[in-house]
């Protein structure tokens, strides 16, 4: 007890469970942000900034209550299935300026209902993973990817909600119709072009070539069969002609009178 009769702070009783609660609180603070990332306050919500950290894969220790996640300007090449399945409160996901080439069909499972913006611009996507993106209601940015303009891409775009601010920057890096290489995809589609019609024409030509091949084989076999039968018939006829003729035998019942 101090000189004034009051207890010193060090002598105050510690509430039951106090050290444990303090330890849990410290652990929660330490685990609230992935290593090498920053988690600033974002309007009272959890924001995780992992931009330009040299990451080669999506971190696994992202807090479950994250609302904004920035993974841009890294070296991520692949988004595996279930990479964000525990982030049910996520609203914005920035994966731009990476090296993403493949996206698993269930890469964004768990985000379909809440995600509002998905940025996949400036990556290495040649084809749109319709199974992964088709179920999302979020605005999607796909600009500056080396997309191959074909029927599958056109069909995938019909199911996506593209970000209107960047849709004009989606261009054909390669195309089934070479005249559209380097041109904005939306401009090509607005002109009335259908990459699917080219696909169907190619399929029809292949089918016609196959049918013609089978028809030619059948005709060849029929001609060979007819000629072989004619040759056999000719040989048989020559054989019959080569046989010696036999004189007719006299009828024993007939006698001279």
From Swiss-Prot:
Protein name stated in the entry: Leucine-rich repeat-containing protein 3
Q: Where are the LRR repeats?
A: 65-86, 89-110, 114-135
Quote the cellular component terms of the Gene Ontology held in the record: plasma membrane
Q: Where are the transmembrane segments?
A: 205-225
Extract the signal peptide range: 1-32
Read off the Gene3D superfamilies from this record.
Ribonuclease Inhibitor (3.80.10.10)
Q: Which gene encodes it?
A: LRRC3
Q: Which residues form the LRRNT domain?
A: 33-64
Top-level taxonomic group: Eukaryota
Q: Which family does it belong to?
A: Belongs to the LRRC3 family.
Entry membrane topology: Single-pass membrane protein
Keywords attached to this Swiss-Prot or TrEMBL record, sorted alphabetically, are: Leucine-rich repeat, Membrane, Repeat, Signal, Transmembrane, Transmembrane helix
**UniProt source species:** Bos taurus (Bovine)
Enumerate the InterPro entries for this protein: Leu-rich_rpt, Leu-rich_rpt_typical-subtyp, LRR_dom_sf, LRR_TM_domain-containing, LRRNT
Annotated compartments: Membrane
Q: Do you know which PROSITE patterns this protein is assigned to?
A: LRR
Q: Which Pfam families match?
A: LRR_8, LRRNT
Q: Where is the LRRCT domain?
A: 145-198
């Amino acid at each position: 007890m101090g000189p004034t009769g009051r207890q010193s702070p060090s002598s105050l009783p510690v509430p039951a469970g106090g050290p444990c609660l303090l330890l849990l609180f410290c652990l929660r603070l330490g685990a609230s942000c992935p290593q090498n990332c920053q988690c600033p306050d974002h309007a009272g919500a959890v924001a995780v900034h992992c931009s330009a950290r040299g990451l080669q894969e999506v971190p696994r220790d992202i807090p479950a209550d994250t609302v904004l996640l920035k993974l841009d300007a890294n070296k991520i090449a692949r988004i595996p299935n279930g990479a964000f399945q525990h982030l049910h409160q996520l609203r914005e996901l920035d994966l731009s300026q990476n090296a993403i080439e493949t996206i698993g069909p269930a890469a964004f499972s768990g985000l379909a209902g809440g995600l509002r913006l998905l940025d996949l611009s400036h990556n290495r996507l040649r084809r749109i993973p319709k199974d992964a993106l088709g179920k999302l209601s979020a605005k999607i940015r796909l600009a500056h990817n080396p997309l191959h303009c074909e029927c599958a891409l056109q069909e995938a775009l019909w199911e996506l909600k593209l970000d209107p601010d960047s849709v004009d920057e989606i261009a054909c890096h390669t195309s089934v119709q070479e005249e559209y290489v380097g041109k904005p995809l939306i401009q090509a589609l607005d002109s009335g072009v259908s990459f699917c019609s080219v696909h169907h024409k190619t399929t029809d030509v292949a089918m016609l070539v196959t049918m013609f091949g089978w028809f030619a084989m059948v005709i060849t076999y029929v001609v060979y069969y007819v000629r072989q039968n004619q040759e056999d018939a000719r040989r048989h006829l020559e054989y019959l002609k080569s046989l010696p003729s036999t004189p007719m035998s006299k009828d024993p019942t007939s006698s001279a009178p």
